[in-house]
Regions:
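Basic nucleic-acid-binding interfaces
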Residues: 1-139
Length: 139
């Protein structure tokens, strides 16, 4: 058995630069593949990812030697680096992010929420979504 163990699940959210709706369906698919590859290369356990035109959601599990801010910096920085020189696929991220801890008992619910982003955003803006999530996580 390893000397250290963690079961730290985090729901991450960040937006595109200036919340521009640049993530078209085809580009979104490419971005998610790139993010998945970055996560794999950096030993970041990415459980699921989805989003809409102006922001993304990820569910990750942190290892004992990982910090949320470092994981986000790695994924955002490397994905921007990958796309920065291609004007047809340019993606830039807004500074900052939101991170919410997820208990193991709520993983299924959070996965469903992430997978159903398109449906959630038919009637709700990103700002309203973030307010609702913040409100639901208050004790």
């Amino acid at each position: 058995m390893p000397a250290s163990y963690s079961s730290l699940w985090v729901h991450l959210i960040w937006s595109t630069k200036n919340r521009e709706p640049v993530l078209t369906p085809s580009l979104k698919h490419e971005v998610f593949i790139v993010i998945n590859n970055i996560a794999t290369d950096h030993e970041i356990y990415l459980d699921c990812i989805n989003g809409v035109a102006d922001h993304v959601h990820l569910l990750i599990r942190l290892l004992t030697d990982q910090a949320v801010a470092d994981v986000v910096k790695t994924i955002k920085g490397n994905s921007w680096e990958f796309f920065k020189n291609d004007p047809d696929r340019y993606v830039s991220w807004q500074d900052g992010f939101a991170a919410f801890s997820v208990s193991p008992g709520n993983l299924k619910q959070v996965r469903s929420y992430i997978y159903n982003q398109e449906r959630h955003h038919k009637d709700k803006s990103f700002s309203d979504e973030l307010k609702d999530i913040k409100q639901s996580t208050k004790s």
